């Protein structure tokens, strides 16, 4: 956290290397989060890119009061939510696809894993976005319930409830 504050101060002074280091430090985490929330690699990359562009453009006014990781995760989550809402309004169809993590070379095993991923994706599409978001943040991004509660500005019991009902 102290290192993040120092990097932010350097960014405010125009140090491009500091911004690059922040990007390198958090991009994988934020990409995993965005991919889990949207289900699409390209959209996730766009969201993370836009978050960092906005962060860089507003760095002069930025004040780090908590965790930089938490702040950036909130930005990614909010932007992902906005993009999904925009899509729903525009097309009225949600086309969320989880990344296929099948790494098996065995064709029958790969088929089973693919079927399981399809079932999981279908199940996730059936639950409300708020529950899906909590489940993916906890399982896919590895965030603790307290972190999710802080990220979403909700009580811990609300987050536990969303997770429990979603599962």
Q: Where are the language model's segments positioned?
A:
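Internal acidic/polar
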Residues: 1, 90-117
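N-terminal module of bacterial RNA polymerase sigma factors
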Residues: 1-29, 36
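Sigma70-family region 2
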Residues: 12-13, 50-67
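Amphipathic, Lys/Arg- and hydrophobic-enriched alpha-helical face
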Residues: 23-41, 58, 124
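Short helix-capping/turn signature of helix-turn-helix
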Residues: 25-27, 36-37, 136-143, 153
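C-terminal flanking helix
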Residues: 27, 31, 52, 128, ...
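Arg/Lys-rich amphipathic alpha helix in sigma70-family domain 2
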Residues: 60-64, 74-94, 113
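DNA-recognition helix of helix-turn-helix
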Residues: 77, 81, 131, 140, ...
């Amino acid at each position: 956290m102290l290192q993040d504050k120092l990097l932010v101060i350097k960014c405010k002074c125009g140090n491009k290397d500091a911004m690059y280091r922040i990007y390198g430090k958090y991009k994988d985490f934020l990409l995993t989060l965005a991919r889990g929330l949207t289900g699409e690699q390209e959209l996730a990359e766009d969201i993370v890119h836009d978050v960092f562009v906005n962060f860089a453009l507003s760095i002069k006014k930025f004040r780090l009061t908590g965790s930089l990781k938490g702040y950036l995760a909130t930005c990614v989550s909010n932007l992902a939510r906005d993009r999904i809402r925009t899509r729903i309004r525009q097309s009225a169809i949600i086309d969320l696809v989880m990344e296929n993590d099948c790494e098996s070379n065995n064709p029958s095993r790969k088929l089973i894993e693919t079927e399981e991923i399809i079932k999981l994706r279908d199940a996730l599409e059936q639950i409300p976005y708020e529950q899906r978001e909590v489940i993916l943040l906890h399982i896919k991004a590895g965030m603790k319930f307290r972190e999710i509660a802080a990220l979403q500005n909700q009580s811990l019991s609300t987050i536990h409830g969303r997770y429990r009902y979603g599962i």
